[in-house]
């Protein structure tokens, strides 16, 4: 069983989803990345399939008719096999050091006398200018 399942809901995300996926691959075999293509009309499905072929033990591509963000998240939940679950939107990315620390903390909690059902961490919103 994977430690963490991460669902990436995607709709016409070809221009930015790779940055998101690449930032999550740092978790290696500890995580499963579920790329949920929500009926995109661009290259989103193709990119998802490429990652699933390249990283078959980490990435799974899920394709469905467009049902909206919530249904894409639900598809991720239905397909998740990890102990913990996280949603990262396709236009977001995670900081490598913070991500590794989160995984380390989850493992330490699992080995201790008590575990957690939910882990909450800080986040930073960075608005990139169009310059």
Predicted feature locations:
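Nucleotide-sugar donor-binding/catalytic module of glycosyltransferases
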Residues: 1-130
């Amino acid at each position: 069983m994977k430690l963490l399942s991460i669902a990436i809901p995607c709709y016409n995300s070809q221009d930015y989803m790779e940055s998101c996926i690449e930032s999550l691959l740092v978790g290696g075999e500890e995580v499963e990345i579920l790329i949920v293509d929500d009926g995109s009309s661009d290259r989103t499905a193709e990119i998802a399939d490429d990652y699933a072929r390249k990283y078959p033990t980490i990435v799974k591509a899920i394709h469905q008719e467009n049902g909206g963000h919530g249904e894409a998240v639900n598809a991720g939940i239905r397909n998740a096999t990890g102990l913990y679950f996280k949603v990262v939107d396709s236009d977001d990315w995670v900081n490598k050091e913070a991500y590794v620390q989160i995984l380390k903390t989850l493992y330490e909690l699992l080995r201790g006398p008590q575990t957690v059902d939910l882990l909450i961490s800080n986040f930073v919103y960075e608005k990139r200018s169009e310059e």
